[in-house]
From Swiss-Prot:
Annotated localization: Secreted, Extracellular space
Organism encoding this protein: Necora puber
Protein family per UniProt: Belongs to the tyrosinase family. Hemocyanin subfamily.
Annotated function: Hemocyanins are copper-containing oxygen carriers occurring freely dissolved in the hemolymph of many mollusks and arthropods.
Hydrolase is among the record's keywords: no
Record bears the keyword Plastid: no
Tissue expression from the record: Hemolymph.
GO cellular component: extracellular space
Classification lineage: Eukaryota, Metazoa, Ecdysozoa, Arthropoda, Crustacea
Protein name: Hemocyanin subunit 1
Length: 12
């Protein structure tokens, strides 16, 4: 999925 450094807010 998203990169490990991404915030949960960014994932959404």
């Amino acid at each position: 999925d998203s990169p490990a450094g991404v915030s949960d807010a960014q994932k959404q």
